[in-house]
Amino acid sequence: MMGVMFSWILVAMHTHTSPSRARMDDDCVDVPAAPDYDPTVCFSLSNLSALPKQCIAPTWSLDPPCPKCWTNDAPEYVPGTSPTTLTNELKAALQSQLPEYLDLMQRQRPPSHADDGTIFSGIGARALLYLKLHEATGDPKFLAQANPYVDAMAAKIESQKLDDRATGATGFQWSHIGMSCVAALAADRAGDAAKAGQYVQDVRAAFTNGDGTYDDFDSGGAGLLYAARFLDENLAPSGKPYIPRPLVYGLASRIISRGSATATAAGHPGVMQWHGPNDDGLWLGQSHGVAGVVQQLLEVPELLENATALGFLRRTLDWVVSQQFASGNFPTEYYNATEDVLVQWDHGAPGVAAALLAGWRAFGQASYRASAERALECVWERGLLLKGLMNCHGIGGNIWMQLYAAKLTGDLKYRYRALAFLGTVLSTGLLSNLTQMRQPQPLPNAPWGFWTGSIESSIELWTDLLYRGPANASMTGWEARL
């Protein structure tokens, strides 16, 4: 598997080609392989003079011979010696860069900018970032800065609902559901319980009026399950769940039922994600795949009391483990199960490791943790991605997954590794200096997205690391806490 070679060109999302069919890398499709090109081999940041010019700014090509990742030269973890908290140097660098990133976002993406309103790629992301800054720092200026973004986002909710009815989207990231959650949170923080309740009703309606076309995290039912957790975690306690538990359990049960149908059709266990059962894209990762669906189902305690659902989830995770490469990575999709390429939150080892650790926490199954640990070794080796700092398919997401692994396992090695990645980023102008780094523009689907843009993803990560610390950092939009 390590010898498989690929080449890449930038294309829009959702494109399918033949015979080389698009992979959900959000920006890549297979083309004929270049000689001696191996996407599993990383390139040393200390030898940039040897890197072809098209591989760095301003072109930032992802085509061969450009590598997928930078070589990780950080030393291995030594218990009791390696740092697992922010050093003074890292803290100073974050304190310097966070205001620069915020200033750039304000100037290039003001509330009046003609973006969509979603959390994934639009104005809602900026509203959420300022609300997070307010929550983490207690500084009222951030709440004031959030308000224009919240207002601009709220003005787009009704039009987004129309789009969602046409597409069947109900996920927190890609639909009006996330926008309504953020608007409810802003109203809650402003002390307007009635207004917050109106937006909560928007979310509740998705549970009662049908849960859409998809089951994946980004656009479907798994993301809707997350929305219920987000409201309960972040809004003022109301004495009862904001989304009634029978509605949450009902949605989770329907996802299990659809997953069972997909398993029968595909001939293997699997919780269905994005496309219908006859589609050939059975994805494995967090965005549109099995990992993202299982991750959210495991957060529904009522489901774990159902023997049928419990058995199905365990069979699904057992099957996922069976798909792991010798490298520790996982395929992007079932029907291209020999492609050991992507090592990022949405596809590959990082996101799948998180789901396996959640399964280990729920079931105590040692094989799930062992598989996750092999996957995290792959992240350590190949997780300094050329694409940038974004959450979805960049270094940021891989830092978050290592912090998550540290929280679930208690193994400080993963927190050290997250901070080692951070140290590499902050000490390398090519990765973090705004005049040198790879900007998000080359990505065609969401140049300034909360998940697909280096600037906004970094603002979220820098905020938590500075003001909450690595042990308490929470990947908003995936973990429930703001």
For the regions a language model picked out, list residue spans one by one:
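Low-complexity, Ser/Thr/Pro/Gly-enriched N-terminal "stalk/linker" regions
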Residues: 27-152, 246-269
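Loop/turn-rich, solvent-exposed surfaces of beta-rich toroidal or solenoidal domains
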Residues: 385-417, 421
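Solvent-exposed loop and edge beta-strand segments that line ligand/cofactor-binding
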Residues: 57, 103-124, 155-176, 208-221, ...
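Well-ordered alpha-helical scaffold segments within catalytic/enzyme domains
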Residues: 65-85, 125-139, 178-191, 225-240, ...
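N-terminal signal peptide
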Residues: 2, 6-30
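Long, well-ordered core segments of solenoidal/helical folds
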Residues: 47, 52, 89-112, 144-162, ...
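Extended ligand-binding clefts on enzyme/binding-domain cores
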Residues: 236-369, 382
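Terminal, non-catalytic domain-edge segments
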Residues: 25-100, 230, 234, 299, ...
